[in-house]
């Protein structure tokens, strides 16, 4: 990083991805360069990767300049899903009525690279129908963490998951 270049302000492949907006104005945000390369090789060219950092507010604000519907599709392993959860917690406060962020959750031991190489472009494109809005992603994660049969658990967990809304 330098004074002029900050990883948290850019994406790998953004210049190329801007040329390939699809009819839904989607862009896939993936974790790694190899994910971008594999998806691109199979014809999915509206894809970028964060540059070895957690997804930042500045990166999403940059993406929104070019795409209305970013889809965060991190690896299906535990670390990838933890990174997705951290991204959701970080990005939800900057949401407004005109912004969208979707999440696409891969199964355990899959990443975009392995998924498309194993199942192909048509399957990946169809799988994109499973994307969910950031708010639903956060609720799903929350309910995976709590014991819904234990009201005390719900109360304690709720205190840890209050998300501020911008007015």
Regions found by a protein language model. Give the residues of each.
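Short secondary-structure boundary/capping segments
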Residues: 43-47, 87-91, 118-122
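Arginine/glycine-rich "motif VI" loop of SF2 helicases in the C-terminal RecA-like domain
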Residues: 62, 90-98
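Conserved nucleotide-binding/hydrolysis micro-motifs of P-loop NTPases
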Residues: 34-35, 53-55, 77-79, 107-111
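A structural micro-motif
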Residues: 45, 68, 99-101
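Acidic beta-strand-to-loop metal/phosphate-binding motif
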Residues: 27-29, 67-79, 84, 104-105
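Phosphate-handling DNA/RNA-contact segment within nucleic-acid enzymes
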Residues: 1-66, 83-84
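C-terminal or mid-to-C-terminal helical accessory/interaction module adjacent to the motor/catalytic core
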Residues: 98-167
């Amino acid at each position: 990083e330098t004074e002029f270049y900050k990883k948290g302000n850019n994406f790998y492949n953004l210049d190329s991805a801007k040329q390939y907006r699809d009819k839904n104005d989607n862009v896939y945000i993936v974790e790694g360069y190899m994910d971008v390369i594999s998806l691109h090789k199979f014809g999915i060219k509206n894809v970028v990767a964060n540059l070895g950092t957690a997804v930042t507010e500045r990166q999403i604000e940059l993406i929104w300049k070019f795409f209305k519907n970013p889809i965060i599709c991190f690896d299906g392993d535990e670390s990838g899903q933890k990174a997705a959860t951290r991204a959701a917690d970080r990005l939800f406060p900057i949401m407004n009525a005109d912004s969208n962020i979707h999440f696409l959750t891969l199964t355990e031991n899959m990443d975009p690279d392995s998924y498309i190489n194993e199942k192909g472009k048509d399957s990946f494109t169809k799988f994109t129908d499973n994307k969910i809005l950031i708010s639903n992603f956060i609720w799903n994660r929350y309910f995976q963490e709590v014991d819904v049969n234990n009201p005390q658990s719900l109360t304690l967990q709720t205190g840890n998951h209050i998300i501020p809304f911008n007015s």
